[in-house]
Regions:
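Hydrophobic structural patches
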Residues: 13, 41-44, 134
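Charged, amphipathic alpha-helical coiled-coil/dimerization segments
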Residues: 21, 72-132
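N-terminal helix-turn-helix DNA-binding core of bacterial DNA-binding proteins
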Residues: 22-66
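C-terminal regulatory/oligomerization modules of transcriptional regulators
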Residues: 1, 125-149
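N-terminal leader segment of winged-helix/HTH proteins
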Residues: 1-31, 79
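Alpha-helical linker/hinge and terminal dimerization helices associated
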Residues: 13-23, 60, 103, 107-119, ...
Length: 149
């Protein structure tokens, strides 16, 4: 495939990716959240024992300052607690409080259900192919962006 044809597909893929991110952004706004805050809540929801702040940073490719600010917001609202990690006292484990679990329970399960239902509209073969191709493209993107600095 020549350069221009590939560029066309890159642009088309980018628009499709934007549609997906827009769905998250709009859903987050309905709950007075940013998409990044929504993603933090999602990670915590699916980590019942809590999650290290550093793991959240890594998963979201976010700076420590960004995640700390989000955690601080939820801490002030009484939605999370911070506990020192036994292996690294500089790192904190983030967990939901009872109020936080109740609050997030109204946000994340419906969103997760929507994702599952949306993907469920595809055939099993299409789902497997989507995941396989997305993994391959994501790895290629990671490598190429590391090469350019």
């Amino acid at each position: 495939m020549d350069y221009e044809e590939v560029r066309h597909y890159v642009n088309q893929y980018g628009r499709l990716r934007d549609v997906q991110f827009s769905a998250y952004e709009l859903y987050a706004r309905k709950h007075n959240l940013t998409a990044k805050e929504l993603f933090v809540l999602d990670i915590l929801w699916f980590s019942p024992e809590g999650c290290l702040q550093s793991e959240i940073c890594e998963r979201l490719s976010a700076t420590k300052q960004t995640i700390s600010a989000i955690i601080k917001k939820f801490l002030k609202k009484g939605y999370v607690t911070l506990t020192e990690s036994e292996t690294d006292r500089r790192n904190k484990i983030v967990r939901f409080t009872e109020a936080g679990a109740e609050y997030v329970g109204r946000i994340i399960p419906p969103a997760a259900g929507a994702e599952i239902e949306a993907m469920g509209e595809l055939s099993g073969e299409d789902i497997a192919e989507l995941v396989r191709l997305t993994a391959a493209f994501s790895e290629a993107m990671r490598k190429k962006f590391r090469q350019i600095g």
